[in-house]
């Protein structure tokens, strides 16, 4: 995340996310604090490829040199006179789109929620851009020169008090890391030493606040708390990084124990996406559930010391352990639980890699084989995590730090059910890692912390989980419920089943006006994407195999094409996107990948659920539209 300070032009933000699976509201685990009240506003703007041609033709035609220089010139022209730095996570995606990310600065310090992303197409010209740069009045002098800010320890105590964090800091000391960053040493209660960073943040009222960004990893919540640097009892916003051989397993796409039997699979990895297999990192070969992509273990006490936790070990690499849904207690089948979790997460890794979530895009791997990105960040998979029940979550720090998935025991059935065995739970949680790493760039894991953008994070998780579980005989009349097995309920844990029937599922874009909770908003987003899925399947057919087949870089069926376009759209859209901006990014992704051959199928799907041409975002009064472009009528 180190970059050059550049004089120039403008947009918005950079953090990590813990996202929980099915909770009705985002509460700070066990402490009664409503984190939704601290969410950042979704304030980014996005210019699609069509917008660029109409409104910024000179910039749209920029080309020549390398893509980084072109992107930098775009920001300079769009935001003249502003200062910014390039974030060190630019890359060329598998679809040929180059993604470059910038952070606005003021007096040599970051404006932590002011980001700019530029997407360069395969032809070297500007495809689209998004930004949230601050354009209000600037402070006269640098606060470091005036020393016009509080001691960081006061801000640390302010964050702990406001969020009721169980951190003991009576003997804490400050270790200075650089001019603007400190570490709080000698504390207890957090999973690692808390950190502080002096930075600006753009407020909703159009002004700029100087803040201490206090980072505290509490396990179920990994928080970036923006504490006012003058009034340390005031917390402006909070970002939560947590979103919330042979293997005997329920083989993909079996979603849960009610729909299939366990079987023994041999060497299930794909050597193109996991060249070291699942049980090696290229340096060490393991005989347990550990490898380059993930490390899985029991975590009965809910603690952070995963390396020393129990995991099954098989010298002959036969991870074959007994399990049946009626077994109890859960600890009696922990080997099977860890093995299933390890299998499912690695399957997700390999599929997402094929679709474009590679090393340079910020995926989760220890050894990146010189392919770009930052390594040393496999996913920590905690089975039967003792820190909670009836839930699951995923912590997504920036690229280079391990992701962490916690899956819990569910007590809504007798005997209790282990969510390691519900593939949809694992896919949903892993997809939080995907969307948080792609949106805003690998170094910025906090771009989905707004209400609508956070809702899309939940919706993407449901969408990938639902698309992956489709059966061979399914058609557009097939309905799917999310989380029915762990919930022991045919209704699952969402408002409605996912369906193309508006009577079965009446949700439309304007339904978001009555919801103020990310899982409800996510259900709306997934309902819209479900229409996209079936429009593309009806046109291109459905590949029922576990992996896509590509022709000239394009999946040759509708299911995997839908997943590919949605994934590419995540990387194209701005930080803290809205439904409208994410829609445009998916359409731009298709323009890049297929030259827009699916434009009308996409528009008709969006319009059916009220996200047509005239749809407009307002957090309290969204405007719906069923209109499509003239050429699609």
Swiss-Prot record:
Q: Where does Zn(2+) bind?
A: 428, 432
Q: Which residues form the propeptide?
A: 21-244
Instruction: Name its GO BP terms in alphabetical order.
Output: proteolysis
Alphabetized InterPro entries for the sequence: FTP_domain, Fungal_virulence_M36, Peptidase_M36, Peptidase_M4/M1_CTD_sf
Q: Write down the PROSITE patterns for this protein, in alphabetical order.
A: ZINC_PROTEASE
Active-site residues annotated for this sequence: 429
Q: Which cofactor does it need?
A: Zn(2+)
Record-given protein name: Probable extracellular metalloproteinase 5
Q: Which residues form the signal peptide?
A: 1-20
GO terms under cellular component: extracellular region
Q: From which organism does this entry originate?
A: Arthroderma benhamiae (strain ATCC MYA-4681 / CBS 112371)
Which enzyme class?
hydrolase
Give the record's glycosylation annotations as residue positions.
285, 592, 621
Q: What coarse category fits the chief subcellular location reported for this protein?
A: secreted
């Amino acid at each position: 995340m180190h970059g050059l300070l550049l004089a120039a032009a403008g947009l918005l933000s950079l953090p990590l996310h813990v996202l929980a699976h099915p909770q009705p509201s985002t509460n700070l685990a066990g402490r009664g604090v409503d984190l939704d009240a601290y969410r950042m506003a979704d304030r980014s703007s996005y210019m699609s490829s069509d917008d660029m041609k109409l409104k910024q033709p000179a910039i749209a035609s920029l080309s020549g040199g390398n893509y980084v220089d072109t992107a930098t010139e775009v920001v300079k022209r769009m935001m003249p006179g502003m200062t910014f730095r390039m974030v060190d996570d630019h890359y060329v995606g598998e679809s040929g789109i180059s993604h470059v990310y910038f952070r606005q600065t003021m007096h040599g310090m970051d404006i932590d929620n002011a980001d700019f992303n530029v997407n360069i197409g395969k032809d070297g010209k500007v495809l689209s851009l998004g930004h949230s740069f601050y354009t209000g009045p600037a402070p006269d002098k640098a606060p470091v020169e005036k020393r016009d800010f509080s001691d960081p320890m006061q801000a640390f105590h302010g964050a702990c008090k406001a969020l009721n964090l169980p951190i003991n800091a009576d003997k804490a000391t400050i270790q200075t890391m650089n001019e603007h960053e400190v570490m709080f040493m000698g504390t207890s209660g957090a999973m690692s030493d808390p950190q502080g960073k002096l930075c600006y943040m753009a407020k909703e009222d159009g002004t700029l606040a100087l803040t201490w960004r206090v980072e505290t990893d509490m396990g179920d919540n990994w928080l970036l708390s923006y504490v006012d640097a003058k009034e340390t009892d005031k917390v402006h916003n909070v970002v939560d990084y947590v979103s919330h051989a042979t293997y005997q397993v329920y083989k993909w796409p079996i979603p849960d124990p009610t729909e299939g039997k366990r079987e023994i699979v041999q060497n299930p990895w794909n050597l193109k996406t996991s060249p070291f297999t699942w049980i090696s990192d290229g340096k060490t070969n393991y005989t347990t559930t550990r490898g380059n992509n993930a490390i899985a273990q029991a975590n009965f006490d809910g603690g952070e010391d995963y390396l020393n936790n129990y995991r099954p070990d098989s010298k002959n690499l036969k991870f074959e352990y007994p399990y049946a849904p009626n077994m109890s207690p859960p600890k009696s089948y922990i080997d099977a639980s860890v093995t299933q979790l390890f299998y499912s997460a690695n399957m997700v890794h390999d599929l997402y890699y094929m679709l474009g979530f590679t090393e340079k895009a910020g995926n989760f791997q220890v050894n990146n084989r010189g392919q770009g990105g930052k390594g040393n960040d496999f996913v920590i998979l905690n089975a039967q995590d003792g820190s909670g029940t009836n839930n699951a979550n995923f912590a997504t720090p920036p690229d280079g730090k391990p992701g962490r998935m916690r899956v819990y025991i569910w007590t809504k059935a007798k005997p209790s059910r282990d969510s390691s065995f519900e593939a949809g739970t694992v896919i949903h949680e892993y997809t939080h890692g995907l969307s948080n790493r792609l949106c805003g760039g690998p170094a910025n894991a906090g771009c989905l912390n707004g209400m609508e953008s956070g809702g899309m994070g939940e919706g993407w998780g449901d969408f990938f989980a639902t698309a992956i579980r489709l059966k061979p005989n399914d058609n557009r009349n097939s309905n799917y419920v999310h989380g029915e097995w762990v919930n022991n309920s045919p209704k699952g844990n969402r408002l409605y089943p996912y369906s193309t029937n508006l009577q079965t599922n009446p949700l439309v874009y304007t339904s978001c006006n009555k919801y103020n909770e990310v899982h409800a908003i996510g259900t709306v987003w997934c309902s819209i994407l479900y229409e996209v899925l079936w429009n593309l399947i009806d046109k291109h057919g459905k590949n029922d195999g576990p992996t896509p087949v590509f022709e000239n870089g394009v999946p040759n069926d509708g299911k995997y094409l839908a997943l590919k376009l949605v994934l590419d759209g995540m990387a194209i859209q701005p930080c803290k996107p809205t439904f409208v901006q994410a829609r445009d990014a998916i359409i731009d992704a298709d323009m890049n990948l297929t030259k827009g051959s699916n434009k009308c199928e996409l528009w008709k799907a969006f319009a059916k659920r009220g996200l047509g041409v005239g749809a407009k975002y307002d957090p309290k009064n969204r405007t719906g539209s069923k209109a499509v472009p003239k050429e699609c009528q």
